[in-house]
């Protein structure tokens, strides 16, 4: 029932891709923790 976890951009990712990944990851964590409580 959890949303899919964002994929890690990998070692060759650009700074923009990494920033996008971290914002997606933060959003994902918010969704997961909100569902639990």
From Swiss-Prot:
Protein's cellular compartments: Secreted
Keyword Secreted found: yes
InterPro entries (UniProt xref): Pancreatic_hormone-like, Pancreatic_hormone-like_CS
Modified residues (Tyrosine amide): 37
Keyword Nucleotidyltransferase: no
Keywords for this protein: Amidation, Hormone, Secreted
Primary residence: secreted
GO molecular function: hormone activity
Domain of life: Eukaryota
Pfam families, per database record: Hormone_3
GO CC annotation terms, alphabetical: extracellular region
UniProt-listed PROSITE patterns: PANCREATIC_HORMONE_1 (PS00265), PANCREATIC_HORMONE_2 (PS50276)
Protein family according to the UniProt entry: Belongs to the NPY family.
PANTHER family, per the entry: NEUROPEPTIDE Y/PANCREATIC HORMONE/PEPTIDE YY, PEPTIDE YY-RELATED
Function (record text): This gut peptide inhibits exocrine pancreatic secretion, has a vasoconstrictory action and inhibitis jejunal and colonic mobility.
Designated name of the protein: Peptide YY-like
Organism: Gallus gallus
């Amino acid at each position: 029932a959890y949303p899919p976890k964002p994929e890690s951009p990998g070692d060759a990712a650009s700074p923009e891709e990494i920033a996008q990944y971290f914002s997606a990851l933060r959003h994902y964590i918010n969704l997961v923790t909100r569902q639990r409580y």
